[in-house]
């Protein structure tokens, strides 16, 4: 472990000195004094999002015994024509949001179905966290239902869903029997969208480690982003990327480096489908490490300077 720690220190120094070209501003209007995290676009105009927050004004005033914070609910905001984010409001008060915690939203490609993690607040019985889904017609959401996966029941703790574009492959995070240690990323498949998902399988021993792999995000069906504290990096959870090779195997994960990653926890990345911009969450600039914030990232345009002599 001492050798690994030394390597991490060297990574931190090198990556801070030579950051990637992305800009990662913190979005003040979306963040609060509580934790704000887990963003998903909710329309193909890419000007409206939902995200999770433990801010005041949620469904319940109770505190989560595990985190000491309020339970998280879904909130929404819209970007106006000037590019500014408008007032943050609760997504709803009695359909998707509950007395428990809702988090890590994922919308299908038609923006009609929301998949998310739900951790109920049952006072008299034990329950785990499950993956739920709800469909939208106009501005109205259906009641959420549990996404059925073979061998998984209500006592299991699973979450952080991301799906293939045809919704036949479901990737999620869980600490399960036959895993590699800590929480791993798993994948489950089905034949059609009306079927139950099959028995989960561990994604890859190249991706998963004896540490924790969480917050998977599938982009264009062949690129998977996730966070890990088991691959080494800048500290805490770092964001990594792996791709499918020509044989359909996941490649060795690559650290996204600074400024995506920091000495804190960096996670929950989501991309615009065709542009190099999106969101992620981090506790990098917080005093107690509990106030996670939402960051926006964008690859700025490359500017060229031309010089020369004009002759007749």
Give a label for each model feature.
Residues 1-309:
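Short, conserved micro-motifs composed of acidic
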